[in-house]
Each structure stands twice: as C-alpha cells, then as structure tokens.
C-alpha cells in the first residue's frame, strides 16, 4: 500500500475522540498522521489528561463530557477508545449509540461489547441513522495476514481445507465465566485470533473446547461453514520468552505459514514429481517457479512498513475506514457483522467445555 500523509488529503473528516488513555495515546492518535482526519476535539473523564492529549495531538478543544462535545462540535466522525465499566463490560455500545444518534460515524476499539445483543443493537441504530461503525480488529489489517488472505484467495491455492492457529491466552474455569469482571482479559484478547480466523477462513459453524485445568490452556476444535477444519491452540503456560503466535493455512496442494505475525512462507504447488528412493538431492522436486516464497521485513531503513503502527495494523485499519467514509462507502473489514460473530463465539466459550457449541449465523 502506498501511504498518503495527513496534509496531502484534499478533504478531511472533522473528528472527535473519546478517550485519552495510554493505548489511545500510543497506538491510535498517532495513526492520524496518515489518515484524512482533522482532529477537532478530544474528551476524557480526566480533564487534565484531555488537555494534554489536545495539546500533543493538535486538537482545538477538549472536554470531560462526551455529550457536551457532541452537542457543541460540528463533527463527521468520532473515535472511541475506553476501558470497561465497574462490571467488567466494555463501554462502547452506549457511547457509540450516543454518537450514531448525533448523526456521526464511529470507530470503536475492541472488544466492542460484552454480548451479541449489544452488537445487534448497534447494528440496528447504525441502520436507522445511516451511519457506519468500524471496530478495531487490528489483526485483520496486519500486512502478513492481508497478504495471506490474498494468497489463499487465488484459484491455484485451492479451497481452504484446514487452519491451525496459536495464541497465548488462558480460558477461565467454567465457574468464573458468568462473572464479566473475571472474563475481562479473555474477552479483550480472544477477538484477536478469531478475527484472523474469520478473515481467512470465513464464518464458523461450531467450536469444541478441550481445556487444561492447571493453567487454563485449551485446544479448540473448529468447523467452518465452508467445511474447513480448524484448530486454535490457546497456549498459555508457555515461556515468556517464546514467540506468541503462529498460523498455518492448508489448501489443496499449497499451504502457507505466518510466524510471529511478520514472517510469511508460501509453499507453492510442486510442478514435478520425484520417484521415491531415486532423488539424490533435495532440490530435485523444486523448480524456480514452485519453490517456497518467503517474506520478512527489514528493520534497517526508516520506512513506514517496519513501524509498529503499520506492522500491527493500527494505521491500516484507520486508513481503510476514513478513506472509505470519504468515498461514501462502508468498511470492508472490522465491521459490526464481524463483531457479531466474534461475540457469539465469545458467548460459546462461556458455556461448559467438552460440548460442541454451534455459532449462529451472523445475519
């Protein structure tokens, strides 16, 4: 992707921002350098923090009441990055609906809600108001995952037959899963691997959880509606020095691997066959047009592609949403439809282990 700098866009979206915490400060506000965003106002319950954010990121005004900001400012779009309430539930549904009813498009960070019912309500209000909502499922925008999506969509890759993924997350014991406060970490993180699985494998038909009671790790068997088989390894218990994630997708005669979110290896279809027991060198089965392809960024040059804002999907997800809004289009990825399935999957995880749990259609 070729990147346009903020000042190069001929038109920009008048933007407000609710939330001035550490995550927003590090990872979301800085993306506006590369998006068609005119940051007009920011809001935080802590007025000092709001004033600081306004000063650092160039907002004209700051507020400690989001309703006051919505009433006073002429905005096109609001970004919302907040924490959970006292019950452990994300604050996004109410805040997003307030913004939608004010006639504004909305970008919210993940996790977008604590229930699929809250997602359905946001879908209803979004449809009612004609305003779009995007959700920060950043892993749908990792360059390695986007490239993987491109490769598996090619006819020569064949239909996806199986997917395996690894993510270091603990699933709380069943007796704790009814308490949203004890599920905060799981809800916050489980959307990461499942958003990638949705991007690459499509909707899920059911999951089956086999959990280890000692540390809360699990092997999750998955059936995609396409018929592909899936396996998600929740690998808590691993060393803190270990790599965190791995993904493999197998088609029909080809496969690819994404390691540590940046290293992609595409094992292409072999165009020759070697009789077993007759090959004297390991290059015999490979031709230049069928050897594996390998990608990994360099970390020497001062490029955008090796910045965390781009490698971790933050800038690409913001650029996608804002540029499509300028074109009068809805987001393609990180949609409320994506969010609906991910919350239905989260609800399935809250049920007892060792049982197949169907995932409802995300219609």
Please place each PLM-identified region on the residue numbering.
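N-terminal Rossmann-like dinucleotide-binding module
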Residues: 1-57
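Beta-strand-loop-alpha-helix segment that lines the small-molecule cofactor/substrate pocket
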Residues: 77, 88-140
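Conserved SAM-binding strand-loop segment of SAM-dependent methyltransferases
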Residues: 59-66
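Short, Asp-centered acidic motifs that coordinate Mg2+ and/or phosphate
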Residues: 41, 61, 77, 162, ...
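Intrinsically disordered, low-complexity Ser/Thr- and acidic-rich flexible linkers and loops
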Residues: 4-7, 80-94, 283-286
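Contiguous beta-strand/loop segments that form the cofactor/metal-binding neighborhood of enzyme cores
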Residues: 1, 188-270, 315-329, 346-349, ...
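C-terminal helix-rich "cap/oligomerization" subdomain common to oxidoreductases
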Residues: 1-11, 17, 77-82, 131, ...
């Amino acid at each position: 992707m070729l990147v346009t700098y903020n000042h190069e866009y001929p038109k920009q979206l008048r933007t407000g921002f609710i939330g001035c915490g550490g995550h927003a400060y590090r990872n979301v506000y800085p993306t506006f350098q590369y998006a068609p965003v005119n940051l007009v106002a920011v809001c935080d319950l802590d007025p000092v923090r709001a004033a600081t954010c306004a000063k650092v990121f160039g907002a004209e005004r700051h507020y400690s009441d989001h309703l006051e900001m919505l009433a006073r400012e002429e905005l096109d779009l609001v970004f919302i990055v907040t924490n959970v309430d006292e019950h452990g539930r994300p604050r996004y549904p109410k805040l997003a609906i307030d913004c939608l009813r004010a006639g504004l498009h909305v970008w919210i960070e993940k996790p977008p809600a604590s229930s699929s019912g809250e997602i359905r309500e946001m879908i209803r209000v979004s449809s009612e108001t004609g305003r779009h909502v995007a959700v920060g499922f950043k892993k749908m925008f990792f360059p390695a995952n986007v490239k993987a999506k491109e490769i598996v969509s090619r006819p020569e890759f064949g239909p996806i037959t199986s997917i395996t993924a690894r993510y270091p997350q603990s699933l709380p014991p069943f007796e704790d899963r009814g308490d949203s406060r004890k599920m905060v970490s799981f809800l916050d993180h489980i959307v990461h691997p499942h958003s990638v699985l949705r991007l690459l494998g499509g909707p899920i038909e059911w999951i089956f959880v086999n959990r280890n009671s000692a540390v809360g790790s699990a092997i999750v068997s998955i059936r995609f509606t396409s018929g592909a088989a899936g396996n998600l390894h929740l690998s808590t218990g691993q060393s803190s020095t270990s790599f965190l994630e791995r993904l493999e997708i197998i088609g029909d005669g080809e496969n690819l691997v994404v390691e540590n979110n940046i290293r992609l290896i595409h094992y292409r279809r072999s165009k020759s066959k070697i009789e077993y027991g007759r090959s004297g060198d390991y290059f015999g089965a490979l031709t230049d047009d069928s050897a594996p392809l390998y990608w990994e960024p360099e970390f020497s040059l001062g490029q955008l592609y090796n910045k965390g804002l781009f490698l971790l999907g933050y800038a690409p997800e913001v650029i996608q949403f804002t540029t499509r809004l300028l074109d009068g289009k809805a987001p393609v990825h990180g949609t409320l439809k994506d969010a609906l399935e991910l919350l239905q999957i989260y609800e399935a995880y809250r049920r007892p282990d060792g049982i197949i749990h169907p995932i409802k259609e995300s219609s």
